[in-house]
Amino acid sequence: MSSRRKFIKKAALGTVGISTVFNTITATEKKAAITNTKKVKKPVIISTWRHGLAANEEAWKQLKKGVSPLDAIVAGVGIPESDPEVRSVGYGGLPDREGKVTLDACIMDKNSDCGSVSFLQSIKHPIAVAKKVMENTPHVMLSGEGALQFALSEGFKEENLLTEKSKLAWEKWLENSKYKPIINIENHDT
């Protein structure tokens, strides 16, 4: 267990290390870094995962067509959500310990309005549902059965999102899983 004293010591050492690195950067390098950040033109699309590259590409295509940035993002995110080879989101995503593909997504517009869904099952495009939550409800988040019922009321269709590949990976995980059963088994995710 880490004590407060150890934490403060590590934080202080980290600060010294970071400041040492920054002090070794030349004035020219500092100016170049600042100058380069000012050259960035809007809009900017950033992804944190490799499968986000296809999402970025689609979002740019949509922007070039004149689609709103928000709709372009939804279209872009829809690409990995539909890809059965992407194991972290959407169709093809790895299931939870019960073998169910549960998804989440969130979105925010330029006015800081936002919408999100969590523990959503059977809906391929949670990002599109999150956008509907933002636009059509007073809520910021819908979860579980409430998110599913809302999605269905908005015209989304239920689909089996568990691909054979993900099912096999889950079954293999079950063979050696050391997951401790949760106490709260009444369909709660908290």
Model-derived regions: residue spans:
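Hydrophobic h-region of N-terminal signal peptides that target proteins for export
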Residues: 17-23
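Generic detector of bulky aromatic hydrophobic side chains
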Residues: 24-25, 57
